Design a protein with these regions (language model features):
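Charged, low-complexity intrinsically disordered terminal segments
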Residues: 2-138, 148-158, 165, 169-461
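Lumenal/extracellular "mature" regions of secretory-pathway glycan-modifying transferases
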Residues: 141-143
Length: 461
């Protein structure tokens, strides 16, 4: 009887906690703040300063994305900084950790920060990560790890993805650090984009802005330092690094960074708040103001989940310019929440004067890019959703260059050709290479059900 009594009270306590956790996780982030325009003012002030000498190239495919990361790490002589939303101990993830281990072995300081929720889900028991963290010159932290007493903090995630070498070169974009985005370790992979930036590192340069931002994230009080542990995985890291050098020796040995990149007029970083808390939509506000500078805007995003404020911003933009969105068709998308929300909200989006290219290409589009006029390109981690606007840390890089803009517009043509264009006037057009894909009935039923069930938590999506 005593045991049953204890179990009964444990069950009650668990039920009370779950009620508390769900209630606070859903309702604490509900009040959405308003932007002050501060980020936009900072951006405008940087435009008036002397432009730093920076060069850029886009990275479009998964093999190049992994190789450029390995090259960047191998080039480091002083320090490597690595920030990512989702690192896993799979093929490409182990390649990256082996390269970081190799850098640390030759005396390079290595700092790694991973989102705490994904770190818990995928790396908490990773011997590879522990072996890397055990190296003398390496420090690994989880951003805002799970806090059972404050469950609402689960909503505030580190969504930045960048890699910096020696404060002079970096890769930044939308790719996570696993086989879905890097290398060719698996067949089904997402479509995404990074940019490589080579800089003189001068005051006011985008790399100096990124370094300042990183330090603010790195020093957040909630972060948890991961304890290293030497094990058989230490030898495995050494062996993997040696194998990488053997396979990619020529590519890793010497890179002419100037030849591999193109000069641009200006590069500037737009960043949201680094704190794990509900955020004012300063980054969204800055992006809207940027889009207002062009008469032709192409917004590439995996999905669209907007509140009334964001819808109104899009509507105001569409009144005086062509505003097109390039996103996944429901039958092509990989995010159930995004797909189900689009099923319900499609007509609302179109009614705002926005035309939508619905991509059907067999691979999920994960690219976050805004092409404005013929000279502005914005690339980074920001999705056109409330999570990016109000909850997560996000980065977008603004590149002023007609050459880069033209190249990225040309890159988008292959996906436009495989799209169904939903016009705001109710019409539909089809790309030259569009092929209809049937959405399985089970998925359609799931998405339809989710579109109703997730209404109470749309602000968290």
């Amino acid at each position: 009887m005593k045991q049953k009594h204890i179990l009964k009270w444990l069950g009650i306590a668990l039920g009370v906690y779950l009620f508390y956790a769900v209630l606070t996780a859903v309702f604490v982030p509900l009040p959405q703040k308003e932007a002050t325009g501060e980020l936009w003012s900072q951006y405008e002030a940087r435009l008036s300063e002397d432009a730093s000498q920076e060069r850029v190239r886009s990275i479009e495919d998964t093999d190049s994305a992994l190789l450029w990361r390995l090259q960047l790490i191998e080039s480091a002589e002083r320090e490597v900084i690595f920030s990512t939303f989702d690192l896993r101990a799979d093929g490409s993830g182990q390649d990256l950790m082996a390269a970081l281990y190799g850098a640390a072995q030759r005396g390079v300081r290595v700092r790694v920060i991973v989102d705490g929720l994904n770190g818990f889900l995928h790396l908490q028991n990773s011997g590879v990560l522990r072996a890397l963290a055990a190296e003398e010159n390496v420090e690994v932290r989880f951003y805002d790890p799970i806090d059972l007493l404050r469950p609402w903090k689960l909503n505030y995630r580190l969504h930045d993805k960048y890699l910096i070498a020696d404060g002079s070169k970096y890769i930044l974009g939308g790719r996570n650090s696993n086989d879905l985005f890097l290398g060719s370790y698996q067949e089904n992979q997402n479509i995404d984009r990074d940019v490589l930036v080579v800089s003189d590192g001068g005051e006011g340069s985008s790399v100096s802005q990124l370094l300042t931002y990183f330090e603010s994230v790195w020093s957040q009080p909630e972060n948890k330092t991961i304890t290293g542990k030497t094990s058989s995985q230490t030898d495995a890291l050494q062996e993997r690094y040696a194998a990488l050098c053997a396979v990619h020796g020529k590519e890793l040995a010497a890179v002419d960074w100037e030849v591999e990149t193109a000069a641009v007029t200006h590069v500037s970083l737009l960043s949201g708040s680094p704190r794990a808390e509900a955020k004012a939509p300063e980054l969204w506000d800055a992006l809207v103001r940027l889009m207002a500078q062009g008469d032709d805007v192409l917004l590439q995003t995996p999905y669209i989940i907007c509140n009334d404020k964001m819808y109104n911003d899009l509507e105001a933009l569409a009144e005086t310019r062509q505003l097109r969105v390039l996103t996944n068709a429901v039958e092509n998308g990989a995010n159930p929440s995004g797909c189900s929300d689009y099923l319900r909200e499609k007509q609302n989006i179109l009614s705002r004067g926005v035309d939508v290219y619905e991509v059907v290409c067999g691979q999920s589009l994960h690219t976050k890019t805004i092409l404005i006029g013929n000279d502005l390109s914005v690339v980074g981690s920001f999705n056109a959703d409330m999570r990016s606007a109000y909850l997560d840390t996000e980065l977008m890089l603004v590149i002023e260059s007609e050459e880069v803009n033209a190249a990225l517009r040309q890159e988008s043509v292959q996906y436009i050709d495989q799209s169904r264009l939903a016009l705001h006037d109710g019409g539909t057009e089809y790309g030259a290479r569009f092929e209809e894909m049937t959405l399985p009935w089970a998925k359609r039923a799931l998405y339809t059900a989710l579109s109703f069930l997730q209404r109470l938590i749309r602000h968290l999506l």
